[in-house]
Amino acid sequence: MSQYSQNQSSGAYPTPPVSTGPYVAPPPLGYPTNDTSHATVATVETKSKGDGFLKGCLAAMCCCCVLDACF
């Protein structure tokens, strides 16, 4: 007969802790969070890139109108 009893106390394997909810993965590195312990806010300056896009659109519309009138 074996020396080890099958009815030993469950002290070797304690019950797992009760979870507080589903696991939520942490955000990726560099993702802004609500943690304000290291809040260093850098001011962002915007630069105007000019009105090249507007001029290009107007030129394209004029070109379409001229081609439509010619053909």
Curated annotation (Swiss-Prot):
Its main location: membrane. PANTHER family: PROTEIN CYSTEINE-RICH TRANSMEMBRANE MODULE 4-RELATED, RCG49325, ISOFORM CRA_A. It is found in: Cell membrane; Cytoplasm. It comes from Arabidopsis thaliana (Mouse-ear cress). This is Protein CYSTEINE-RICH TRANSMEMBRANE MODULE 6. Keywords: Cell membrane, Cytoplasm, Membrane, Transmembrane, Transmembrane helix. InterPro entries: CYSTM_dom, WIH1-like. Mostly expressed in roots, stems, rosette leaves and siliques and, to a lower extent, in flowers and cauline leaves. Pfam families: CYSTM. The keyword Cell membrane applies. The gene is CYSTM6. Homodimer and heterodimers. Interacts with CYSTM7 and WIH1/CYSTM13. Residues 1-36 are annotated as: Disordered. GO terms for cellular component: cytoplasm; plasma membrane. Involved in resistance to abiotic stress. One of its GO terms (molecular function) is identical protein binding. Belongs to the CYSTM1 family. It is a single-pass membrane protein. Coiled coil: none annotated.
